[in-house]
């Protein structure tokens, strides 16, 4: 369900209207007064970004010293409304040189009105791509892109890009060296018990691309996901090759991906935007490969002494290594003195966060390291208060490793001129919320 916005307002922190545009006649002109009275003056701006007053809903967001308010009179997709605001602000910043505040709006109100007419039609979001809009809406106002075309480049077809199927990529791009960079970046989230049992685990990942390709290329990406391999084996009428396959959950794609072909062939086919973009996002809950296992042992020796022993083992391949490994081991607030030994890296006590911070610059695969510590506590009078042990937290980054097991099987580029391309693929796994109870 789209936004179907009735009006949009830009207000300063005092509630003064800087700019507004009404797209439908189903709301009155006093909507901004209702927003001031029921939301701004009642100090409820930070509580909920969506409020319903009367028969209208207000979807608002603060950017710098400006409130952007979308008024909706019917049922609408609120998430789509926030997405529109974020992309609209990015568009304005691209025109204003990176700034978006009250002064920028006052200095460029004519341009903003022109953009508001282009990016939303009868309350429905349209094209918000800065690259496409700048072809026919310039800094000075209404001006044809043909009046300042470069002599050594083909003239972009603005009409095709605004109304055609490839509105995210302009024509006439040319590079001396055609390259594609693909990064699979994953964050692994874990909650493990003190005995090493996995209580909760999942991976959130994204496929990032940088494309420097001439012309209008078609790209096809093959992954070792279960659905794609099964579909490929059906089309070739033979069983799929043995090997690790994964099942992707909650997959979302960039608008450039051909969803019709994905639904029928289960392949990621697309005409890429120029430069950097996020091709897809996904989530995995089954078959996660944990990069580290942590086994903590904490003994309380009376009221004033503790012994801590933490063993960290890397589970990934022996030829790989992790960078920037940080292990935060919680200790009681009344810690007075610490003595510890580590087999690898360096450790110190940080009283501001009540943790032993163990840092290892480079952690090879299939190895283990140990921290042993003796902790002296301040003696307190009265009854002993039990210490609620927070979990151990880890930070790390493992190049060329994916916790999901996702791999690129192929990346093909077709373009009518038949040029050669260079493809680069990189894998990175980072720690999300990686916690071990102790």
Curated annotation (Swiss-Prot):
GO terms for molecular function: lipid binding. It is found in: Cell membrane; Membrane, Coated pit; Golgi apparatus, trans-Golgi network membrane. It holds the Pfam family Adap_comp_sub. Residues 177-437 form the MHD domain. PROSITE patterns: CLAT_ADAPTOR_M_1, MHD. GO terms for cellular component: clathrin adaptor complex; clathrin-coated pit; Golgi apparatus; plasma membrane. This is AP-2 complex subunit mu. The keyword Transport applies. Its main location: membrane. It comes from Arabidopsis thaliana. InterPro entries: Adaptor_comp_med_subunit, AP2_Mu_C_sf, AP2_Mu_N, Clathrin_mu, Clathrin_mu_CS, Longin-like_dom_sf, MHD, Mu2_C. Signal peptide: none annotated. Subunit of the adaptor protein complex 2 (AP-2). Adaptor protein complexes function in protein transport via transport vesicles in different membrane traffic pathways. Adaptor protein complexes are vesicle coat components and appear to be involved in cargo selection and vesicle formation. AP-2 is involved in clathrin-dependent endocytosis in which cargo proteins are incorporated into vesicles surrounded by clathrin (clathrin-coated vesicles, CCVs) which are destined for fusion with the early endosome. It is a peripheral membrane protein. Keywords: Cell membrane, Coated pit, Endocytosis, Golgi apparatus, Lipid-binding, Membrane, Protein transport, Transport. Adaptor protein complex 2 (AP-2) is a heterotetramer composed of two large adaptins (alpha-type and beta-type subunits), a medium adaptin (mu-type subunit) and a small adaptin (sigma-type subunit). GO terms for biological process: endocytosis; intracellular protein transport. Belongs to the adaptor complexes medium subunit family. It comes from the Eukaryota.
